[in-house]
Amino acid sequence: MRKITLLVCLLAAVLAFAQFSGPGYYRVHNVGSDRYISIKGTDFNNTTNPDAFWPCILMLNDSAQISDPASIIYIPNMGQASLYAQGVSTYSLTGLMLKIELDTVCVDDKPVYLAKTTYKHFPCIFRDYGLGLTAGTLGGAPEYYWWIEPVNAESIETSFLGLQPVNNEVADADGWYWATICVDFPFTLPEDGGVEGAYTVTDVVMGIDSLYYAEPVKVYGQGDTVPATVPVLLKCAAAYPSGNKIIPVGDIANNTNLPLKSDLLMGNYFSTFYNHCSFAHPEQYGEYIPDDATMAAPGYLVLGVSEDGRLAFCPKEASEDDNTYLAANTAWLDITDLDLSGVTTIYLGQAPVEPEIIRGDASGDGVLNVKDVSCVVNYLLVADSEESQKAEINIEAADFDGDGRVSVRDIALIINELLMEE
């Protein structure tokens, strides 16, 4: 049972931890349903009817909001306001402004807020009692109350954006997990937050195994700020979101040209629709036109796990209704302009190359020493008829003089090289 206490509004605002403290990034948490607002944009209904909020806002359970960028809401003010996320605003999606008010009620010793609008001259109060964001007129019940929880450097222990790796069971050869992201806000990679760095992909190369590889190139490390609208790969220490923390900072960004592109990576905000709206100027409100889906294409490969169980960029699998929408807030590899016709798997990592040959390193241990002399001597002494007893040597390295065969001359040259090193 939640403890509801009537307090003086000003005292609540000063003493409580979770509160609106000026323009910035927040999560909006319903008291009654214990769910969070996220801006999804799966449907649009630009009208003055407050029910227009219902299709463009999805309420998330606590476990889901941790890793969903759509739950990171930029709130500019408490007056006639709009909620900004995913490159759009609730005003541009619905045509409705919100009035956010600090109430005189505290819940769990934290101040709560009311979200209001006006419809046909009647006040409406937004609520969530488990069926999504709807408007009512009565108020007073827990589902009408909202906590506004800051997401910033000071809140990192309790409120952050956590990254969910593309697969929590498959790491790279060094034990790192990988995630992708594309968001409308800059974010920092905090020290000891679990995210080692942000990476891009600049090229795809073939390895000596005749497979293709995309080697991540590090562009930002811990303590750095990743700019908004830049699709990146993120190298993560943990298999779960709470172990891979990033923090939104700075000003929210807008970009009317989606998908967003950086090197060979592309990214999006929404899954189902492109973003065509600029909320920078009031006269452009309402221009959000969902005319194109962010669909998979032959040259788009998403990060996942290959058939042989390795991290790789592969084609997006079709869903049950045969739609191949690319997931929201992700980055994918665009090989459209590369000469890779028919290539459907590109492994994440450095392409294997021919090992460097050290002249005289007959044993193949990477060091030129007396052991190499013994290997060549053994190789030459054992008769060809006793091939199975010959020492295993690197013929190319043992052929020190490069005449195409291993001989006593090579032994002499190896010994001479060792003496010169001393």
Residue ranges of predicted features:
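A short, polar beta-strand/turn micro-motif
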Residues: Y145, P150-V195, G221-E354
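Cellulosome-associated attachment modules in secreted, modular CAZymes
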Residues: P50, D62-A64, D68-P69, P352-E422
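Lectin-like carbohydrate-binding module/patch detector with strong preference for beta-trefoil
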Residues: Q19-E157, N255-S262
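Hydrophobic h-region of N-terminal signal peptides that target proteins for export
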Residues: C9-A18
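Positively charged n-region of N-terminal signal peptides that target proteins for export
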Residues: M1-I4
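Surface-exposed turn/loop modules enriched in turn-prone residues
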Residues: N45-S67, Y177-S210
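Short, flexible beta-strand-to-coil junctions
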Residues: H29-D34, G41, Q86-T90, K116-Y119, ...
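Acidic glycine-/aspartate-rich tracts in secreted/extracellular proteins
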Residues: G41-N45, V105, Y119-H121, A237-P241, ...
